[in-house]
């Protein structure tokens, strides 16, 4: 994703990740040059949009939060992440745990100081785990949400975060049934990854200015996910989640989506696609069952409710803000955060509402026990053809000289008449490379 100077910390689509010891990364000189060109173009195009309004930048900064506690050993850590925790002074036994993921160029401490999560951890008694990536992983300190080596179950950064949750249980006595995850921008996109890859670990998640799971498969496609966004059917998005953990039958995590109406970096269309993805996973329609507005700024909330009466998915559209975490500095019960750092935007305390959605203040009951409802599946159809023919037939798209399967986004290789694949369609409009027998 584009290179961004430290004063502009939030765009989630990074340049090609740096190689890690023992984890070779793909991409040669041509890709690096292409990324450099894209970086320059996008930085020029979005630089002004990444600067918060003057009233936000000049807002007074409260005293910084207490320094986080670094955890030096929590597992094999295949993603080479760093683990920090905020532990309330009186952490109860079997406390919930919330994993928090920062945006590009940010740090765990900066996210803790400005997001307001620690305020509610101290108030309600839950542990916050802050995962932090480094420039050794990614030049812009973005989580690698679009890289197969990091966004799949058991691999890379996703596996490292999973190990952090397990360590929280063994070291701090947290309740493994009450683990949640949230993040901003690239951290929001990685939140989507974790909910899809480890649905049995995370009871709920909150994606702030993020991207649906399965959208980006490489650097180039990641740009398209950010803007203009990718339109897929709810069934296709849901299938991407199910494919992340084949055979898993539920229950599925509850998901809250937060997005600024004026976000120029990760366009608001992504909130719609996230809604489509997770409502379909839960077997729900895309028409809200309840709508409301939240004070103090008339944030528009849409809720999608299970047959048992519980909100499985909610979308919160924040008026008048761009790309960042909504905060509301102050000492009131619904206030939190600071706005002295870019991409923490004065509007509404999203951490207050996210904490409520997670049920950490006692306002949400335990999930119903009815089994999840999956949409009906249709028999798969298969086609064997060249990449050129797949694109002509609408089963694939082409970008930068390569072909990508429509729906799944799988890289089919060079766009020509020589490379041939068998593509399977299930559900309608979602194509994947067929493995094994294909009817």
Feature names for model-found ranges:
Residues 257-259, 263:
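Short beta-strand/loop motif that positions the catalytic acidic residue
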Residues 113, 117, 169-171, 176-250:
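Primarily recognizes the serine-hydrolase "nucleophile elbow" in alpha/beta-hydrolase
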Residues 370-439:
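Tryptophan-rich substrate-binding surfaces of secreted polymer-degrading and adhesive proteins
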Residues 91-139, 215:
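Short substrate-entry loop that stabilizes the transition state in hydrolases
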Residues 149-172, 193:
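Alpha/beta-hydrolase active-site loop
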Residues 99-105, 209, 259, 319:
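The conserved beta1-alpha1 loop
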Residues 2-8, 20, 29, 33-37, ...:
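A domain-start/cap signature at the N-terminus of enzymes
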Residues 132-156, 218-219:
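Cap/lid segment of the alpha/beta-hydrolase catalytic domain
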């Amino acid at each position: 994703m584009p290179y961004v100077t430290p004063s502009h910390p939030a765009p989630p689509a990074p340049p090609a990740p740096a190689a890690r010891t023992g984890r070779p990364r793909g991409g040669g000189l041509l890709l690096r040059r292409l990324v450099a060109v894209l970086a320059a173009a996008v930085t020029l195009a979005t630089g002004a949009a990444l600067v918060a309004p003057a009233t936000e930048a000049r807002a007074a900064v409260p005293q910084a939060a207490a320094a986080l506690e670094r955890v030096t050993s929590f597992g094999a850590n295949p993603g080479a992440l760093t683990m920090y925790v905020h532990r309330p002074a009186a952490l109860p036994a079997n406390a919930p745990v919330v994993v928090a993921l920062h945006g590009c160029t940010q740090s765990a401490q900066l996210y803790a100081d400005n997001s307001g999560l620690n305020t509610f951890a101290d108030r309600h008694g839950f542990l916050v785990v802050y995962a932090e990536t480094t420039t050794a992983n990614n030049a812009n300190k973005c989580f690698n949400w679009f890289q197969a080596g990091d966004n799949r179950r058991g691999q890379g950064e996703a596996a490292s975060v999973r190990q952090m949750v397990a360590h929280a249980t063994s070291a701090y006595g947290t309740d493994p049934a009450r683990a949640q995850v949230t993040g901003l921008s690239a951290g929001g996109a990685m939140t989507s990854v974790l909910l899809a890859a480890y649905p049995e670990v995370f009871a709920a998640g909150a994606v702030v200015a993020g991207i649906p799971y399965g959208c980006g498969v490489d650097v180039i496609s990641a740009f398209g996910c950010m803007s203009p966004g990718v339109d897929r059917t709810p069934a296709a998005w849901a299938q991407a989640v199910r494919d992340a953990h084949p055979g898993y039958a539920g229950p599925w995590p509850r998901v809250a989506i937060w997005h600024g109406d004026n976000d120029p970096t990760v366009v608001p269309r992504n909130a719609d696609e996230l809604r489509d993805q997770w409502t379909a996973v839960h077997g729900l329609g895309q028409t809200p069952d309840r709508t409301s507005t939240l004070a103090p700024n008339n944030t528009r909330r849409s809720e999608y409710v299970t047959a048992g009466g519980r909100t499985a998915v909610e979308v919160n559209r924040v008026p008048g803000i761009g790309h960042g975490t909504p905060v509301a500095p102050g000492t009131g019960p619904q206030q939190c955060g600071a706005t002295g750092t870019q991409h923490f935007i004065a509007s509404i305390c999203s951490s207050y509402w996210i904490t409520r959605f997670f049920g950490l203040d006692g306002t949400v009951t335990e999930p119903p026990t009815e089994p999840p409802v999956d949409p009906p599946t249709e028999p798969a159809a298969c086609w064997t053809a060249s990449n050129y023919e797949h694109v002509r037939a609408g089963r694939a798209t082409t970008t930068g000289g390569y072909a990508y399967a429509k729906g799944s986004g799988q890289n089919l290789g060079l766009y020509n008449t020589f490379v041939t694949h068998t593509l399977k369609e299930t559900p309608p409009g979602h194509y994947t490379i067929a493995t094994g027998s294909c009817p």
